[in-house]
Amino acid sequence: MSIISIAVDAMGGDFAPEAVVSGLDFALTNLLDDQNVSFNIYGQGSQVLPILDKYKDLKEHSVFIDTPEVVLANDKPSFALRKRRSSSMWCAIDSIKSGVTSGVVSSGNTGALMAISRFLLGTLPNIDRPAICTALPSRGEEYFVLLDLGANIESSSNALFQFAIMGSAFAKAVLNIASPKVALLNVGQEEVKGTDVIREAFLLLKQAEGRINFCGYIEPIDILGDKVDVVVTDGFCGNIVLKVAESIAYTFKSVFEKSVTSSIISKFAGLLLKSQMKKDFMRFNPKMYNGAMLLGLNGVVVKSHGNADKVAFAHAIKVTVNAVRNDINAKIIHELS
């Protein structure tokens, strides 16, 4: 297996650079097996190097590049494009363009990450707007793809059509589904429901049934079921759906922990159920599916949650490595041709 190099923005996120560097070590030790991966770590040496020195194995699998600037959480994308060209985020993305690395991951400012990536890397052929995409657990044992998760607050019908094609290709490459079932998120399943944009996207997808396994509309109540493999929506709705799903997972865990300590009987029942409940929660734990790909860019760019700890960031690294190994962009180009 050939070695691949992943660029890492060590300064992005609420807990950077500690969570980033420790997350890299966690990924290397627990998630990547023998994947033959090295890291190009971009950040401010005064903050990153003292942490990196704690992890001998990681140091042997990485190169550190000192960058003087940081893209801040409140930086506007236009400002980051003009004034943050020596930042860890910019330099990490630029390493893909120059061929030094094969993918990049950052927990930093989403708008800046998208803007800089589009500026430096451009988009794939026939793609107007990239979309943020991830695979989420369903009620069964399977996963489904959800996009857009926030790259585009408003989307045209043609953009939703492109998202559907890209999401289908992602499901084929990452989830190994031969003919992914694709649906548009809507307030009802009847063809007359929804906005003009959604109904126009419905018609475009219906006309492309030879290229895509389009199943019509899906309501929010059904997305965690096993009805479809790809759910398509605009970034406004998609981001809300994702955050509500994460909130439900943490709320369920909190409610269960309180209920099993309310009495002696419930404590005993909790002990009996603890192992299975822990297993079930881990599957729905947002940390386990952290890492969303910016689909449609001419390069592998993965956005990690801004509040990711080391475990969550490690899973974003795993997503990045898998996207590179699966040659996801080549498969999207094939689907769009």
Curated annotation (Swiss-Prot):
InterPro entries per record: FA_synthesis, Phospholipid_synth_PlsX-like
UniProt keyword terms in alphabetical order: Cytoplasm, Lipid biosynthesis, Lipid metabolism, Phospholipid biosynthesis, Phospholipid metabolism, Transferase
Single Gene Ontology MF annotation: phosphate:acyl-[acyl carrier protein] acyltransferase activity
Compartments where located: Cytoplasm
The keyword Glycoprotein appears for this protein: no
Catalytic reaction(s) noted: a fatty acyl-[ACP] + phosphate = an acyl phosphate + holo-[ACP]
EC code(s) of this entry: 2.3.1.274
GO CC aspect terms: cytoplasm
Pathway: Lipid metabolism; phospholipid metabolism
Entry similarity comment: Belongs to the PlsX family.
Subunit structure: Homodimer. Probably interacts with PlsY.
Described function: Catalyzes the reversible formation of acyl-phosphate (acyl-PO(4)) from acyl-[acyl-carrier-protein] (acyl-ACP). This enzyme utilizes acyl-ACP as fatty acyl donor, but not acyl-CoA.
PANTHER family, per the entry: FATTY ACID/PHOSPHOLIPID SYNTHESIS PROTEIN PLSX, PHOSPHATE ACYLTRANSFERASE
Name this polypeptide is given: Phosphate acyltransferase
Species name: Ehrlichia chaffeensis (strain ATCC CRL-10679 / Arkansas)
Lineage: Bacteria, Pseudomonadati, Pseudomonadota, Alphaproteobacteria, Rickettsiales
